[in-house]
């Protein structure tokens, strides 16, 4: 049997869906491809990423310049990955030319050992592995590839996954020494790091003074009401009117609704955007021209499977309902913190 392409498989999957689901899914695909700007996050990340390029532009001393570490932390669903990718893309555009080779992007697998992280870096530089390597060999090969490519920055996303492997203070220090030796090498241009993940990563960086003094920290703080009400309301209006081209029911921009939305998203900016995307796509899929509270309720029910009595968009005492996303955020926090508590 001949294999079909991913594009053809997707077309067949879409064709198998009911008309409303097909329209909704197609619209969500469009929304997922765009980046929704956020002034607060974007400015903080722009300043952080800029330190990498300012450092690289310095005149070398003794033939090299130290690399920087930009540590980006935020709870699950905060929108870290998209925001970092956007900040790096803007910096590349400002420099001009084809500079993709100057930026290595890799994802820490889950679970993750030090050796597996080295292989993730090798994957990020498109190095073809035919078999799994021992930890020391993997890091040595990663170092050789980084020396060859000379990237300005290596971005490791979801780095909290390494914490499950670091069960003691000694293991954490050994890992940080490995990173210093094989990634933050004395050379020009310097290799800098962008490390992103849950807030517990700050504790890991604090275990090494040489690492800590290089860190520029960017914290993507959770949303709160009423502090971020206007910020979230702008997103609601921008997504529904500009991105999807629909009208907005007055109730959907009220303070009471914005508070519901922030609560349901567990204060995570990225999740709040996802909820608005899903609701707008629901109305679009059903062929209606106005997004209402019911679209948010339907989208939440479809995504989570929760009954009406546990749907924050339906019940009067919504602030007493623990949203599904809050459980997911809390679980990620517990899993990341446990190894650090054991090591302490």
Regions found by a protein language model. Name each.
Residues 93-122:
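AAA+/P-loop NTPase substrate/partner-engagement loops
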């Amino acid at each position: 049997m001949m294999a079909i392409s991913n594009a053809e498989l997707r077309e067949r999957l879409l064709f198998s869906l009911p008309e409303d689901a097909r329209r909704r899914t197609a619209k969500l695909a469009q929304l997922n491809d765009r980046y929704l700007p956020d002034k607060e996050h974007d400015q903080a990340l722009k300043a952080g990423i800029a330190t990498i390029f300012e450092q690289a532009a310095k005149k070398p001393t003794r033939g090299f310049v130290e690399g920087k570490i930009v540590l980006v932390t935020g709870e699950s669903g905060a929108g870290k990955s998209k925001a970092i990718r956007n900040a790096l893309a803007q910096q590349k555009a400002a420099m001009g030319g084809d500079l993709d080779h100057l930026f290595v992007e890799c994802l820490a697998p889950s679970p993750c050992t030090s050796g597996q992280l080295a292989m993730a870096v090798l994957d990020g530089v498109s190095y073809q592995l035919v078999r799994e390597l021992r930890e020391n060999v993997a890091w040595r090969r990663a170092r050789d590839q980084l020396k060859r490519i000379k990237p300005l920055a290596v971005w490791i996303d979801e780095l909290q996954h390494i914490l499950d492997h670091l069960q003691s203070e000694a293991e954490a220090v050994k890992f940080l020494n490995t990173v210093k030796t094989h990634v933050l090498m004395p050379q020009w241009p310097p290799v800098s790091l962008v490390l992103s993940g849950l807030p517990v990563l700050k504790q890991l960086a604090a275990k090494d003074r040489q690492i800590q003094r290089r860190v520029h920290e960017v914290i993507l703080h959770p949303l709160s009401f009423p502090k971020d009400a206007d910020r979230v309301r702008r997103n609601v209006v921008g997504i529904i009117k500009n991105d999807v081209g629909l009208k907005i029911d007055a109730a959907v921009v009220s303070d009471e609704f914005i508070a519901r939305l922030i609560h349901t998203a567990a204060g995570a900016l990225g999740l709040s955007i996802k909820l608005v995307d899903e609701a707008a796509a629901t109305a679009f899929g059903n062929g209606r021209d106005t997004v209402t509270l019911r679209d948010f309720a339907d989208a939440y029910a479809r995504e989570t499977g929760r009954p009406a009595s546990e749907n924050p968009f339906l019940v009067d005492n919504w602030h007493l309902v623990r949203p599904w996303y809050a459980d997911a955020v809390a679980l990620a926090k517990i899993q990341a913190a446990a190894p650090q508590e054991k090591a302490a």
